[in-house]
UniProtKB/Swiss-Prot annotation:
Belongs to the Aux/IAA family. Changing residue 88 to L: In axr3-1; gain of function. Affects auxin-related developmental processes. Affects photomorphogenesis. It is found in: Nucleus. It comes from the Eukaryota. Changing residue 89 to G: In axr3-3; gain of function. Affects auxin-related developmental processes. Affects photomorphogenesis. It comes from Arabidopsis thaliana. This is Auxin-responsive protein IAA17. Changing residue 187 to A: No effect on interaction with ARF7. Loss of interaction with ARF7. Keywords: Auxin signaling pathway, Nucleus, Phosphoprotein, Repressor, Transcription, Transcription regulation. Changing residue 114 to A: No effect on interaction with ARF7. Increased auxin response of mutants axr3-1 and axr3-3 may result from an increased stability of AXR3. The gene is IAA17. PANTHER family: AUXIN-RESPONSIVE PROTEIN IAA17 (PTHR31734:SF126). Aux/IAA proteins are short-lived transcriptional factors that function as repressors of early auxin response genes at low auxin concentrations. Repression is thought to result from the interaction with auxin response factors (ARFs), proteins that bind to the auxin-responsive promoter element (AuxRE). Formation of heterodimers with ARF proteins may alter their ability to modulate early auxin response genes expression. The keyword Transcription applies.
Length: 229
């Protein structure tokens, strides 16, 4: 009886320190302590972060490999030069068209020449290939310049006999205006000294000059005709 009371008094006895400090804390089995639990959680949080970092690094590495493996975009073709004018026909095409036209026997090019008359304040331009003879040219000039009349003193195709000096001088003196032309040599000659096709090819311009001024051309025309003969 006394022993049990002493034990109870001992348990309820006040003393300095935490109660039960002299007793060994019983083992709590397999439960973890607070500090162990915190350390474990920290370790678990670090492991996924490391895994994510490694995954991101792998992804970046893979992307860089893909970019290096992919070919670069092909270079864009240079912009074409803007065509000026319409239709856009270049010079070499024009030359090809002209050569093809000549080879195919197309129409001949026009032979435009300027026509002037002494005392007339204006000029005319005609296409010699529109006419077939000197007579047709004379009629056309008569319509252009009413003051000009060309008599039919010539022979075949309206050609003038430049080999006969007397007839030539009579012809020049009988006309108020005499048709003359500048040939490729730069010499002024009387119209009708050569056959018509040759005249069309050699004539550069026409001039209806006064008969008194054309007298000086007669000897020169005779000399040139003799040299051609």
């Amino acid at each position: 009886m006394m022993g049990s009371v002493e034990l109870n008094l001992r348990e309820t006895e006040l003393c300095l320190g935490l109660p039960g400090g002299d007793t060994v804390a019983p083992v709590t089995g397999n439960k973890r302590g607070f500090s162990e639990t915190v350390d474990l959680k920290l370790n678990l949080n670090n492991e996924p972060a490391n895994k994510e970092g490694s995954t991101t690094h792998d992804v970046v590495t893979f992307d860089s490999k893909e970019k290096s493996a992919c070919p670069k975009d092909p270079a864009k073709p240079p912009a074409k030069a803007q065509v000026v004018g319409w239709p856009p026909v270049r010079s070499y095409r024009k030359n090809v068209m002209v050569s093809c036209q000549k080879s195919s026997g197309g129409p001949e090019a026009a032979a435009f020449v300027k026509v002037s008359m002494d005392g007339a304040p204006y000029l005319r331009k005609i296409d010699l290939r529109m006419y077939k003879s000197y007579d047709e040219l004379s009629n056309a000039l008569s319509n252009m310049f009413s003051s000009f009349t060309m008599g039919k003193h010539g022979g075949e195709e309206g050609m003038i006999d430049f080999m006969n000096e007397r007839k030539l001088m009579d012809l020049v003196n009988s006309w108020d205006y005499v048709p003359s032309y500048e040939d490729k040599d730069g010499d002024w000659m009387l119209v009708g000294d050569v056959p018509w096709p040759m005249f069309v090819d050699t004539c550069k311009r026409l001039r209806l000059m006064k008969g008194s001024d054309a007298i000086g051309l007669a000897p020169r025309a005779m000399e040139k005709c003799k040299s051609r003969a």
